[in-house]
Amino acid sequence: MTAPYLGNPKRTIEVLQKYEFVFQKKFGQNFLIDTHVLDKIVNAAEITKEDFVLEIGPGIGTMTQYLASAAREVFAVEIDKALIPILEDTLQDYENVTILNEDILKVDIRKLAEERNGGKPIKVVANLPYYITTPIIMGLFEGEVPIDSITVMVQKEVADRMQVGPGTKDYGALSLAVQYYAEPYIVANVPPNCFMPRPKVGSAVIRLTRHEKPPVAVEDTKLMFCIIRASFNQRRKTLANGLKNSPELSFTKEEIQNVIAACGFPEGIRGEALTLEAFAALANAFVKLR
């Protein structure tokens, strides 16, 4: 297996110039040019020769080379067709890599895992475009894809939101959704100078290890997340007002007040004060009203 040779500014510039590549803002392209960060990502993902790895947004193949050297198979999905000939060049010596030119949100990942990995859990590794981080991660979790872990580069602010608890300014619907499905752990903070071009914000590598089973028992998961969204759509409103004003919910003011009281919460409590367990209790109480 060929050793990785990309991952530094000089080699990246050489490849980009060779193909006269122009960065596309609409794709949120920021390529990693720091080998230490690449090592941290691959090590955090705990890739072995048994693993099937889905890489989202391989760029010029920098991290793909690292992944291919460690995994059984890498399936790289790249939306920018201008990068496909570059990937075919930089990855030509890696026989265990498949490249697909497609929007990851249009890929049937569950079917992919079944066909390429026998339905066993896959590992997802990516330097994600920041503008589409949440739809990708939630799509993976909510789509019932068999996943072992997701190790990704994201905007630092988003990584912080994924792992915080109640009572903090970053706590919200994303925190609760991620923590329902996985155990989040920030591996490293990454400064802008580790990318080309440099992003205007700080970044972080976060690993999301899928729970074998959710940490709370919920009779209606969809309802729980409707309640969560309603609780944070207007953060400064009380929980009762947030639920009453939600277009996703149809409970009366009296029903809402009765459920909140039955769960033992103060009348003026806000959603930002509730734990995942508390939201599960709320959802289960509302289910009984049906």
Where are these regions (language model features)?
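Catalytic cores of RNA-modifying enzymes
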Residues: 1-230, 261, 272, 281-288
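C-terminal lobe and adjacent flexible extensions of AdoMet/dcAdoMet transferase-like proteins
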Residues: 210, 229-290
